[in-house]
Amino acid sequence: REQILKIHASNKPLEENVDIRKIAERTPGFSGADLENLLNEAAIFTARKNKKIITMEELLPSIEKVILGPERKSRVISDKEKKITAYHEAGHALVGHLLPNTDPVHKISIIPRGRAGGYTMSLPSEDKYFHSKSEFIDELAMMLGGYAAEEIFFGDITTGPSSDLQRATKTARNIVTRYGMSDKLGPRTFGKKEEMIFLGKEMAEEKDYSEETAKSIDDEISALVEEALKTAKKIITEKKPVMEKVVAALLEKETLEKEAFEDLLV
């Protein structure tokens, strides 16, 4: 990625101290087209500020725009919704930070972006080609950190965690049916997936298991999600004072970078 960025940056006016390596580290999974798009977005940000030279100040927000879509600062949010979002994102961040097998939290924001009310950005320290079961388990708990925080601090759940629940359910299903990581069902896969080219590469699944096994798969998925939620709730309950500090900082500043977030945890 570093080399691709250098190629696309060669015809752009970058400040001398721009850290291309840092940008490469923050863009795992980006294709060549994504990286080109990122530099184009940074050039647009720079032009809007009537600046001639692209700096890290324009490059870092461009990463988030490519991943999550544009900021929607014009969207009017009530104080109550803002507060719920702050607890929700603080829940993700705290659970993610305290579990050993998750990617480091780089940024937390309660500024709406794309379709999200806020976001917590975690990035791997290095490129990964394999994923372990312990990583999936901890990631599940982090995904449910927002749901857990809403339940603990408000005694209610909003529609905010719906995409988290979809991701968690999909991850749990993959643990059981694709990666053979279920203790109960053992080292095998379930459901033959075939690409249906004429449907635009939509995946068709051929069910190669019984109704009884289907129920066991559902039970295992539910058990994984419930255990992850239990883990998230335990962490948040034990760290309530820290949560309050993170929430207060988010409500004041709207965005916390990695260093500012970690300073609050001391």
Please provide the spans of the model-predicted regions.
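Short pre-active-site segment immediately N-terminal to the catalytic Zn-binding motif
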Residues: 74-84
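Short, conserved phosphate-binding/catalytic loop or strand-edge motifs used
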Residues: 60-63, 114-116
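Generic detector of short, locally flexible boundary/turn motifs and exposed helical patches
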Residues: 1-2, 25, 52, 57-61, ...
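Conserved C-terminal "switch" segment of AAA+ ATPases
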Residues: 2-60, 69-70, 74, 143-151, ...
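Short hydrophobic/aromatic residue motifs in ordered secondary structure
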Residues: 34, 91-92
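Soluble catalytic regions of large protease machineries
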Residues: 82-87, 93-266
